[in-house]
């Protein structure tokens, strides 16, 4: 009979099989009330599942991350329960957990309106407030198929036919008269599922295949308590205010249009930000001793076949043909960089060779996934590839890590989560090579005092990698930076160098990206700063305004003087009230507004205001220029007097 070992090392002995709920009840009624599920020998199980042998057990509650996921998954079933009551002929497809919530794909003979979604959410609350028990039943494959066939649930039948082995025993979860199929676990009672909200609907093809029927996807969010739900909704509200698409339109940065889906039309101010970002990255490339190169954006398909991209990536590649040759528009820069490396004989003395490019890449992303600057088809990578020997890996990775943190800190990103992905089952190279490569990455992180977690088996077949995920002011995660070792591509493309022993050797290639996509990073920055870009990045840094026509000449003189000092400045000489001008440029998020009246003309000074409404008073013009130059040169995140 089972001996149950708890996380604190204590043991409980039973003379019969017990469930996690039984053990929780044995410990105390408070824990039993909080028990959502159990973790038995590392595996999540339902609170009702029996433990027949000795086991390690953790009780899962709403305070655990897994508990919250289970709540969200059960809310998806609750959605199914409600929609079948409101529209009984609905066919249910899949309802998984996603970040911060869940969704369910449904086949419904009507297009859901906002009023329908509100009615659906209301019914979900009515059902949840009944606090009914969720009943789990393990059945044979044939019984599960018969259950769903009798209910007309063709999508569930399809899942059973195509994805579940006949000797498997699927789990059925009964919500009163509603039944769903799932691996589980799920909440034992609906009292855990009171804090949710339906968010939106969208179209989604069955199994993600555009040849299949378009279903309706209903998104929701769910949390353990009301406070967490409200905090999340508040973050969403703030995120909506910061939406880069909205701000991009307000500030006239860029636009997208149907004739070029996923391609950016940069306007003058947006392109100014893009170019300033390039200048910043270039300064770091110089500091860290990179070459900058430029490869063609289109190359023969034969090259992509050699690299393996054609076999694994062709659906995401744009192609064209000319003179009976097929070309691929590059989705990435690495093959082109190997071609540059291959020009001329290389010696070990030439290594490491650090090659960077602002590479214009294109990927045929599904149209439904396109999202402003965050998900595009045409983008620019701040890409680099380092060719080095195995002995140089650690030092080069060290340099990449320092560069990542150097650049992210410039934008004020302080919370960065780092993950090290290790060897997958299918891989090339010897275990010794992988041992050394993984150790090199780990030691480089440790030497920089960077905490990290392992993602076991998540590396590419050609090498391990480090991923850098930054968190913004709303605590949203953005995976941007990568340092990826590659033991395959140089060999596939015949890259070599002459070693100290005069023998030809294949270099190791390190793929390195920091911002990732320039377009996406500008989207991230737009939302991080809510359009209040730091002065060095702002498209227009200063606007000089007159109060009456008598100051126009002085304004023009000052405008020229600031422009000559390298400051992006505009004059506003319109015949409008000064309050109107200030409001307008404040809404345009211009960092500094300089106001000229008769007093300023007489004194040769200038009145300085910030976009946050702070009046810095009258200042000497040369002093203003000097302070602005210092702020811009240092790429400060703060404005004068902050």
UniProtKB/Swiss-Prot annotation:
Family named by the database record: Belongs to the class-II aminoacyl-tRNA synthetase family.
UniProt subunit comment: Homodimer.
Residues engaged in binding Zn(2+): 334, 385, 511
Bound cofactor: record note: Binds 1 zinc ion per subunit.
Domain TGS: 1-61
Database matches in Pfam families: HGTP_anticodon, TGS, tRNA-synt_2b, tRNA_SAD
Superkingdom, taxonomy of origin: Bacteria
Biological process terms in GO annotation: threonyl-tRNA aminoacylation
Record-listed N6-acetyllysine modification sites: 286
Region described as Catalytic: spans on this chain: 243-534
Name of the protein: Threonine--tRNA ligase
Keywords, ordered alphabetically: Acetylation, Aminoacyl-tRNA synthetase, ATP-binding, Cytoplasm, Ligase, Metal-binding, Nucleotide-binding, Protein biosynthesis, RNA-binding, tRNA-binding, Zinc
Compartment annotation: Cytoplasm
Domain notes: The C-terminal domain recognizes the anticodon bases but the N-terminal also contributes to the precise recognition of tRNA(Thr) by ThrRS.
The protein's Enzyme Commission number: 6.1.1.3
Cofactor section: Zn(2+)
Molecular function, one GO term: ATP binding
Role: Catalyzes the attachment of threonine to tRNA(Thr) in a two-step reaction: L-threonine is first activated by ATP to form Thr-AMP and then transferred to the acceptor end of tRNA(Thr). Also edits incorrectly charged L-seryl-tRNA(Thr).
GO CC annotations on file: cytosol
Reaction(s) catalysed (UniProt annotation): tRNA(Thr) + L-threonine + ATP = L-threonyl-tRNA(Thr) + AMP + diphosphate + H(+)
Signal peptide region: none
């Amino acid at each position: 009979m089972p001996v149950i070992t708890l996380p604190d090392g204590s043991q409980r002995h039973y003379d019969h099989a017990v469930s996690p709920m039984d053990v929780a009840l044995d410990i105390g009624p408070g824990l039993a009330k909080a028990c959502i599920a159990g973790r038995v020998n590392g595996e999540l199980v339902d609170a009702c599942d029996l433990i027949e042998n000795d086991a390690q057990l953790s009780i899962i509650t709403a305070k655990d991350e897994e508990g919250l996921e289970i709540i969200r998954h059960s809310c998806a079933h609750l959605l199914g329960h409600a929609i079948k009551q409101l529209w009984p002929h609905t066919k249910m497809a899949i309802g998984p957990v996603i970040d911060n919530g869940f969704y369910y794909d449904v086949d419904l003979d009507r297009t859901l309106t906002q009023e329908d979604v509100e009615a659906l959410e209301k019914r979900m609350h009515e059902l949840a407030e009944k606090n009914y028990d969720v009943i789990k039943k393990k059945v044979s494959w044939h019984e599960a198929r018969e259950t769903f066939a009798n209910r007309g649930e063709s999508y569930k039948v399809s899942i059973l036919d195509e994805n579940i082995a006949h000797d498997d025993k699927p789990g059925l979860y009964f919500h009163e008269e509603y039944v769903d199929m799932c691996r589980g676990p799920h909440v034992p009672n609906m009292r855990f599922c009171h804090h949710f909200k339906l968010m939106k609907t969208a179209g989604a093809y069955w199994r993600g295949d555009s040849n299949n029927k378009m279903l309706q996807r209903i998104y929701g969010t769910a949390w353990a308590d009301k406070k967490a739900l409200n905090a999340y909704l508040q973050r969403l509200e703030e995120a909506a205010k910061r939406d880069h698409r909205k701000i991009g339109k307000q500030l006239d940065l860029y636009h997208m249009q149907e004739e070029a889906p996923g391609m950016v039309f940069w306007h003058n101010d947006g392109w100014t930000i893009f170019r300033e970002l390039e200048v910043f990255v270039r300064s770091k490339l110089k500091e860290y001793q990179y070459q900058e190169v430029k490869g063609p954006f289109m190359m023969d398909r034969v090259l992509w076949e050699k690299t393996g991209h054609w076999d694994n990536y062709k659906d995401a590649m744009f192609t064209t043909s000319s003179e009976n040759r097929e070309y691929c528009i590059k989705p990435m820069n690495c093959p082109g960089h190997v071609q540059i490396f291959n020009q001329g004989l290389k010696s070990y003395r030439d290594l490491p060779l650090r090659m960077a490019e602002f590479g214009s890449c294109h990927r045929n992303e599904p149209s439904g996934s396109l999202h402003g600057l965050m998900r595009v088809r045409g983008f620019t990578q701040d890409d680099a590839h380092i060719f080095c020997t195995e002995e140089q890996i650690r030092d080069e990775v060290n340099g990449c890590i320092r560069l990542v943190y150097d650049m992210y800190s410039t934008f004020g990103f302080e919370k960065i989560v780092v993950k090290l992905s290790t060897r997958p089952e299918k891989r090339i190279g010897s275990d010794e090579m992988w041992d050394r490569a993984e150790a090199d990455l780990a030691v480089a992180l440790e030497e920089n005092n960077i905490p990290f977690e392992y993602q076991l088996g998540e590396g590419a077949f050609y090498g391990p990698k480090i991923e850098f995920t930054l968190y913004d002011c709303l605590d949203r995660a953005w995976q941007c930076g990568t340092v990826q070792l590659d033991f395959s591509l140089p060999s596939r493309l015949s890259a070599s160098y002459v070693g100290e022993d005069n023998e030809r050797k294949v270099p190791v290639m390190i793929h390195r990206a920091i911002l990732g996509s320039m377009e996406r990073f500008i989207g991230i920055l737009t939302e991080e700063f809510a359009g209040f870009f730091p002065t060095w990045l702002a498209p227009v840094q200063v606007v000089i305004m007159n109060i009456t026509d008598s100051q126009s000449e002085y304004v023009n003189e000052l405008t020229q003087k600031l422009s000559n000092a390298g400051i992006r400045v505009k004059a506003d000489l319109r015949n409008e009230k000064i309050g109107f001008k200030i409001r307008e440029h404040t809404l345009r998020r211009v960092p500094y507004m300089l106001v000229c009246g008769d007093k300023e003309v007489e004194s040769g000074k200038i009145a300085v205001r910030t976009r946050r409404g702070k009046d810095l008073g009258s200042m000497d013009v040369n002093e203003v220029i000097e302070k602005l130059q210092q702020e811009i040169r240092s790429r400060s995140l703060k404005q004068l007097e902050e």
